[in-house]
């Protein structure tokens, strides 16, 4: 069976890899307008942490745990995990108000409250939580998945996808998987999905070894001496150009968290549009091609907010199960 995947960000490429790894005889072609290094995921720092998703949705917990287990196994079994920007990272959550443990703390399972002595290092904070999480840098782990996808026989066709039917009829695909992120607003006419603009700054600061977040600001070191400063969470803002006021706000906010940022060189200022939605859409939909009359199934997998690198493998496994169920039913 030949399956089409629309979108080549972290969700699209991980879905494609999982299908090729788990379903013998399946062929996969990805159709996408952008490939790495030009996807939204390439901008992401890649810290494992649920963000801009409905944590009350029971599926989120399952997807988080599945992805965290995948990343732990990736580190344990891949000697080159640092090359692909994947490693453990100590994370400090700081606040002026008491902190409560969240789904993130439950998943990583190693969080502890900072004591009075430790908090003296952060004079603008009264409370803190320390945890060990995992980072999987978008610009490094995406090439890993692309390489693996091609090694498994996958194909990528770069094109602007205007509708599902045009993709389906290319090879009369019985299944089309929609991982188009924000593109689903037009592809599905889904007005529940909207942009959440995120602006970040990359600086050279190899002395920063831990991640910090306080209110809307965060500091996330990468594996090559680069540190990501953020951020913005601007709903329904389609501007993909850096904003000088946002840059100033990010720098000023991060300076209140950690001393010594004043002299760091700014390497780049980047903007990405996260696919915001009240809940992730992961479900199947039966369709009939308007032009050919052929029936096919769309599996939707989009609306991951700021948690693409936190949910991707759990969602990929669920998509894989839906595909497996369809294949099994077709044999009956």
UniProtKB/Swiss-Prot annotation:
Binding residues for D-proline? 218, 274, 306
Name one process (GO BP) from the record.
D-amino acid catabolic process
Gene Ontology molecular-function annotations: D-amino-acid oxidase activity; FAD binding; glycine oxidase activity
GO CC, alphabetical: peroxisomal matrix
Residue sites binding D-serine per the record:
218, 274, 306
Identify the residue span(s) of motif Microbody targeting signal: 330-332
Q: Which reaction does it catalyse?
A: a D-alpha-amino acid + O2 + H2O = a 2-oxocarboxylate + H2O2 + NH4(+); D-alanine + O2 + H2O = pyruvate + H2O2 + NH4(+); D-arginine + O2 + H2O = 5-guanidino-2-oxopentanoate + H2O2 + NH4(+); D-asparagine + O2 + H2O = 2-oxosuccinamate + H2O2 + NH4(+)
Cofactor needs: FAD
What protein family is recorded? Answer: Belongs to the DAMOX/DASOX family.
This protein is called: D-amino acid oxidase
Q: Native species of this protein?
A: Dugesia ryukyuensis
């Amino acid at each position: 069976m030949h399956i089409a995947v629309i979108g080549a960000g972290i969700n699209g490429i991980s879905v494609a890899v999982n299908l090729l790894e788990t379903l013998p005889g399946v062929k996969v072609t990805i159709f996408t307008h952008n490939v790495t290094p030009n996807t939204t995921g390439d901008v992401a720092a890649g810290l494992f942490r649920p963000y801009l998703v409905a944590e009350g949705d029971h599926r989120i917990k399952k997807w988080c745990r599945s992805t965290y287990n995948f990343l732990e196994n990736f580190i344990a079994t891949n000697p080159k995990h640092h090359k692909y920007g994947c490693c453990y990272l100590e994370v400090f959550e700081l606040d002026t108000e008491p902190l409560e443990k969240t789904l993130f703390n439950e998943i990583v399972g190693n969080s502890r409250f900072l004591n009075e002595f430790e908090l003296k290092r952060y004079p603008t904070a009264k409370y803190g939580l320390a945890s060990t999480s995992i980072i999987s840098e978008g610009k490094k782990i995406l090439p890993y998945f692309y390489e693996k996808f091609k090694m498994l026989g996958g194909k990528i066709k770069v094109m602007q996808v205007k509708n599902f039917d045009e993709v389906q009829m290319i090879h009369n695909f019985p299944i089309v998987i929609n991982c188009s992120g924000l593109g689903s607003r037009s592809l599905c006419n889904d007005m529940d999905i909207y942009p959440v603009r995120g602006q970040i700054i990359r600086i050279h600061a190899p002395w920063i070894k831990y991640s910090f977040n306080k209110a809307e600001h965060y500091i996330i070191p990468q594996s090559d001496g680069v540190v990501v400063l953020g951020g913005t969470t601007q709903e329904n803002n389609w501007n993909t150009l850096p904003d000088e006021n946002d840059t100033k706000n990010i720098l000023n906010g991060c300076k209140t968290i950690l001393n010594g940022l004043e002299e760091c060189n700014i390497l780049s200022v980047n903007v990405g549009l996260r696919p915001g939605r009240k809940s992730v859409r992961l479900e199947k939909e039966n369709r009939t091609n308007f032009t050919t009359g052929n029936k096919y199934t769309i599996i939707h997998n989009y609306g991951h907010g700021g948690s693409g690198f936190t949910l991707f493998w759990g969602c990929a496994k669920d998509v894989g199960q839906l595909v497996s169920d369809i294949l099994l039913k077709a044999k009956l």
